[in-house]
């Protein structure tokens, strides 16, 4: 499942880089100790990855509070994603996405609903991965 989600994000990033001519900047919010997706994304030379968490687990993770984000960290972000974010931070993640006008991917817990009001995130299935994506109003 995680390989399928990683590959979907890589494909999205490659499309973005091809369209813009620039590397794709991806920020993972609330990375915790599960860093395998961001680590896989970093293997691609066309992708710049920043991992954030309120309590960084190592030196590769930047300390940031989603309720008071350090906006300079997120400048020029193309894709935000979060794996199993608690319901209480999901609205703050969407608010940041709205400010940045970028793609948002959220992979909730298997049996959890999203807690994002008034936004129509699309359920996406890619291989064995199921997640929600929001690219703005169409």
Residue ranges of each PLM-predicted region?
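Conserved SAM-binding loop of SAM-dependent methyltransferases across substrates and taxa
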Residues: 33-45
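Adenosine-cofactor binding site in Rossmann-like domains, unifying the SAM/SAH pocket
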Residues: 51-72
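Conserved class I S-adenosyl-L-methionine
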Residues: 21-33
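Conserved S-adenosyl-L-methionine
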Residues: 42-48, 99-101
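Residues in the short beta-alpha loop(s) of Rossmann-like NAD(P)-binding domains
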Residues: 32, 55, 110
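C-terminal substrate-binding/active-site "lid" region of AdoMet-derived donor-dependent transferases
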Residues: 87-138
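S-adenosyl-L-methionine
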Residues: 1-22
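A short acidic, Gly/Pro-enriched loop at the edge of an enzyme's catalytic core
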Residues: 71-79
């Amino acid at each position: 499942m995680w390989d399928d989600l990683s590959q979907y994000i890589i494909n999205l990033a490659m499309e973005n880089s091809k369209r813009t001519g620039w590397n794709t900047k991806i920020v993972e919010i609330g990375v915790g100790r599960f860093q395998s997706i961001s680590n896989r994304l970093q293997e691609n030379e066309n992708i710049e990855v920043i991992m954030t968490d309120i309590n960084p687990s190592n030196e590769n993770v930047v300390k940031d509070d989603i309720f008071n984000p350090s906006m300079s960290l997120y400048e020029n972000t193309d894709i935000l994603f979060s794996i199993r974010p608690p319901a209480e931070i999901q609205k703050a993640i969407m608010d940041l996405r709205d400010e940045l006008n970028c793609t948002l991917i959220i992979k909730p817990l298997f049996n959890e609903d999203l807690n994002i009001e008034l936004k129509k995130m699309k359920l996406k299935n890619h291989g064995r991965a199921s997640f929600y994506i929001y690219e703005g109003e169409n």
